[in-house]
Amino acid sequence: KMAMQYYVNKNQRREKVLSLKNSYHGDTFKTMEVGDSSEYHFAFKQKTNVDHINTNIEELEDAFKNHGEEYYCMIVEPLLQGAGGMKMYDISFLKRARELCDEYGVLLIFDEVATGFGRTGNRFVSDLVLPDIVCLGKALTGGYIGHAATVASDKVYEAFYSDESGKALMHGPTFMGNALAMTAGIKSLEIFKRENYMKKISHIEEFSKKLLSGYKNPKIKEIRIMGGCIAVEANN
């Protein structure tokens, strides 16, 4: 929503989104559209203004070469795709995506609802590659109460900063700024820092790799480890 209006406010017409295969971004209509999960959204016809690519730099470059000036955003789950099968990929893909988004004037969105707060072994993947918009949730409140945050760069903010009411981002959910959720969020952040969860996650990753490295079993196709995530893919 923010990315779409960003270009409207700048009097530019862009109508396409670049997303990833195996992606999942939620269950509202627009997030279902940019996701690649027919298993979840089989009852809803998929629109044709979204391109889905693999986490392959050659496919990424081809997509921008063919449609770069039509995209208003590229949205990804950075480094780790959760509901799409715990798929893990290299940060070089995100670095190239950042370069191409800058070259073609496309907003880069990181959906860190699942990957944020250390899940990948990084506090945020956004610390390594800076997006224009980042979405946060889940661990933000420690799982005790539903709450989320959307963080935007100065560039995005400035496109909405105007005396013209038509340029404002009209967004006001009933539970926005909920006091109980905000309190849980503040405490969750305090605990995350005080108990040094990044160090704990590092130990989990190190131990898991030591334990599972080289493990062979005819029933197991692959074992993937990243940060606090362990994916064991069975042979089907």
Where are the regions a protein language model picked out?
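Conserved N-terminal phosphate-binding loop of PLP-dependent enzymes in the Aspartate aminotransferase
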Residues: K1-N236
